[in-house]
């Protein structure tokens, strides 16, 4: 049976050996070039392929159409993936009549995603395993073909568990590959309600947070022990690595991170104490705990910290342009809730941020980005993170003022992007779900969905293509000039302070604000083209939490990524949104102050938006990247968002001349 194999690491080597032993004909192997910054303790797939006389390739992008065509020419009957590190596109998966199968190092549906070996140890699991499953477009989500359980002993560390998983994988493949070859397999669908997903880990993720229980810190040490990069902490600015540890149920009133004793080297934790059995100062040699204490100059009562002392005192400076807007003011609130951010903001008004104006770590200037270019350039240079949130993002303006949309949304933002390139500053840029346009995919995927818009004589697409071109410019600056960036795409965020009722009166607002105005004024709710268009509505609190995690950027996981931020479970048509809003309005305690409901009225889009408008029938996000990069998923139900948004706007209405 002819196969093409995607493989890396020890699992890749043993998978290839198992295929050959089972009589498969391997036409080609795709692998990765080794990362010079990674300690290569594992077998080389490339060397094995060369020794076996099998063609081997390591393309940067195996999903490029040229590689898809070359793989198609190989006519594989079945495809296998053994620890290949990139997602394989659906076009390749569909090339094999018998399907494609992946070996994953966990008991799916638990621990989908990256680094399951390390994550199960971090989380203190007592059992894991290996799974062979059918590959589908979504990562690690296909039907299960076979599984083998592996017990995790209390003294297991990453390398010992790795060896156990390799042994289990050999057994699993020996048992299962002949059955696949003969088409004699039983597949079991994964239970989505039991699925968990974890993102990529980097060396920077393994810092020891001493306020946590000793058992949690010990699990971290186990999860990244040699040959992984190791868990680490700091004495002042001196970094040291902990290679092995033990938990002590030591009852101490000492502050977490305090040295309780030198021999053994005991550190107070949030609960109990951690004994550092072996460790390493800086780039030195490994030594036992008490010698490490001497090397670091520790004495009883010394304090350890999770980051360098000089870093701990420095607040991250965040520049938010458009700080008074919907996202800007909510993000400011979230950042100021923490104690390590300094927020600098510019906008043409301050009504939504008035509650922050006296905050010691909030600095605001009233101004226009098209005028205050010198102020902006200075603050881009001064700050660490830049969020240019200024844009015209209301559909009626796309047809009413297309040139103004282009000038503000594209030209002004391009200037800010170039400042970030010039001063080598990190930019977090608000793309938009509008860039997907009329895409027909069930889920809009950041890395694979096509971006489809209408003809030039439909000016409603000027916002979409302006944002898309900026996305591409930012991506190119990242590739060619090292710009540190993340693009995020909000999907219909809703909540208090979304637009205002005055904007709705002139038609320049988002859907829910316009509907609320209709209820407040007793005018009919207009359903554009029947209101059957579906959207996925996202609570502003869920959206801001995801955006906050992008700013935090744990382990630099968000660098160079495009991340949809939306709630695929909160899908509703505009008509359904109106009905839910009406039901909430009718039971609101202020309802009696407002006129009777005037009903729904169907209107044509051309009469409402003007000529040149086209609508999109559905817009549902894939949030795979948000899971992977942010460990995030939305939690808030749409009805709760509607209730809170309505309540906010009703309480802004002057009721003095309303009937009681």
Swiss-Prot record:
Keywords: Antibiotic resistance, Lipid A biosynthesis, Lipid biosynthesis, Lipid metabolism, Lipopolysaccharide biosynthesis, Multifunctional enzyme, NAD, Oxidoreductase, Transferase. The record marks 140 as: Raises pKa of active site His. Its EC number is 2.1.2.13, 1.1.1.305. One of its GO terms (biological process) is lipid A biosynthetic process. Residues 314-660 are annotated as: Dehydrogenase ArnADH. The active site is at 104 (proton donor), 434 (proton acceptor), 619 (proton donor). Transmembrane segments: none annotated. Residues 1-304 are annotated as: Formyltransferase ArnAFT. Pathway: Nucleotide-sugar biosynthesis; UDP-4-deoxy-4-formamido-beta-L-arabinose biosynthesis; UDP-4-deoxy-4-formamido-beta-L-arabinose from UDP-alpha-D-glucuronate: step 1/3; Nucleotide-sugar biosynthesis; UDP-4-deoxy-4-formamido-beta-L-arabinose biosynthesis; UDP-4-deoxy-4-formamido-beta-L-arabinose from UDP-alpha-D-glucuronate: step 3/3; Bacterial outer membrane biogenesis; lipopolysaccharide biosynthesis. The record marks 102 as: Transition state stabilizer. HAMAP family: ArnA. In the N-terminal section; belongs to the Fmt family. UDP-L-Ara4N formyltransferase subfamily. In the C-terminal section; belongs to the NAD(P)-dependent epimerase/dehydratase family. UDP-glucuronic acid decarboxylase subfamily. This is Bifunctional polymyxin resistance protein ArnA. The gene is arnA.
């Amino acid at each position: 049976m002819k196969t093409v194999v995607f493989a890396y690491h020890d699992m890749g080597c043993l998978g290839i050996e198992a295929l050959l032993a089972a009589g498969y004909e391997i036409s080609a192997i795709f692998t990765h070039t080794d990362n010079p910054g990674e300690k290569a303790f594992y077998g080389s797939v490339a060397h094995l392929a060369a020794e076996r006389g099998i063609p081997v390739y390591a393309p940067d992008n195996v999903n490029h159409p040229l590689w898809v065509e070359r793989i198609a020419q190989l006519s594989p009957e079945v495809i296998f993936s053994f620890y290949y590190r990139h997602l394989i596109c659906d076009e390749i998966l569909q090339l094999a009549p018998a399907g494609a199968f992946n070996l994953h190092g966990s008991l799916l549906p638990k621990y989908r995603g990256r680094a399951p070996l390390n994550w199960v140890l971090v989380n203190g699991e007592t059992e894991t395993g290996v799974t062979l499953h059918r590959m589908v477009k979504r990562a690690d989500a296909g039907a299960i073909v076979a599984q083998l359980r592996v017990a995790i002993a209390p003294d297991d560390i990453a390398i010992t568990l790795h060896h156990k998983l390799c042994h289990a994988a050999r057994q699993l493949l020996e048992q299962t590959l002949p059955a696949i070859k003969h088409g004699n397999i039983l597949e079991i669908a994964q239970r989505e309600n039991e699925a968990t997903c974890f993102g990529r880990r980097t060396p920077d993720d393994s810092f020891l947070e001493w306020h946590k229980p000793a058992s949690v810190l010990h699990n971290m040490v186990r999860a990244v022990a040699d040959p992984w990069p190791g868990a680490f902490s700091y004495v002042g600015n001196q970094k040291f690595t902990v290679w092995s540890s033990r938990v002590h149920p030591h009852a101490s009133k000492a502050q977490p991170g305090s040295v309780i004793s030198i021999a053994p080297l005991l550190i107070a934790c949030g609960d109990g104490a951690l004994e550092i059995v072996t460790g390493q100062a800086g780039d030195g040699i490994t030594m036992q705990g008490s010698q490490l204490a001497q090397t670091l100059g520790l004495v009883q009562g010394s304090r350890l910290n999770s980051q360098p002392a000089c870093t701990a005192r420095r607040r991250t400076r965040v520049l938010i342009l458009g700080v008074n807007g919907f996202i800007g003011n909510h993000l400011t609130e979230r950042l100021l809730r923490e104690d390590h951010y300094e927020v600098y903001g510019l906008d043409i008004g301050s009504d939504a941020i008035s509650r922050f104006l006296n905050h010691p770590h909030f600095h605001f200037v009233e101004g226009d980005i098209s005028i205050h270019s010198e102020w902006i350039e200075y603050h881009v240079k001064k700050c660490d993170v830049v969020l240019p949130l200024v844009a015209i993002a209301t559909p009626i303006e796309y047809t009413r003022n297309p040139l103004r949309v282009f000038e503000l949304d594209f030209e002004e933002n391009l200037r800010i992007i170039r400042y970030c390139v010039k001063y080598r500053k990190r930019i977090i840029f608000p793309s938009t779900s509008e860039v997907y346009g009329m895409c027909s995919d069930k889920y809009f995927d950041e890395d694979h969905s096509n971006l489809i818009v209408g003809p030039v004589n439909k000016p409603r697409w000027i916002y979409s293509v302006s944002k898309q071109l900026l996305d591409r410019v930012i991506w190119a600056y990242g590739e060619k000039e090292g710009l540190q960036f993340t693009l995020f795409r909000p999907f219909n965020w809703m909540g208090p302070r979304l637009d205002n009722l005055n904007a709705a009166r002139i038609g320049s607002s988002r859907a829910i604000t316009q509907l609320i105005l209709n209820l407040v004024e007793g005018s009919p709710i207009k359903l554009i083209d029947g209101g059957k268009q579906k959207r996925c509505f996202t609570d502003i609190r869920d959206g801001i939490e995801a955006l906050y995690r992008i700013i935090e950027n744990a382990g630099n996981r968000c660098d160079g990524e495009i991340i949809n931020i939306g709630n695929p479970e909160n899908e509703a048509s505009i008509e359904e949104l109106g009905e839910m809003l009406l039901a909430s309005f009718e039971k609101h305690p202020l309802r009696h102050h407002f006129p009777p409901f005037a009903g729904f009225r169907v209107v044509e889009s051309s009469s409402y938006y003007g000529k040149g408008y086209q609508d999109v029938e559905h817009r549902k996000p894939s949030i795979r990247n948000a899971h992977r990069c942010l460990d995030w998923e939305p939690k808030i139900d749409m009805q709760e968002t509607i209730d809170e948004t309505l309540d906010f706007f009703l309480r802004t209405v002057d009721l003095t001349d309303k009937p009681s």
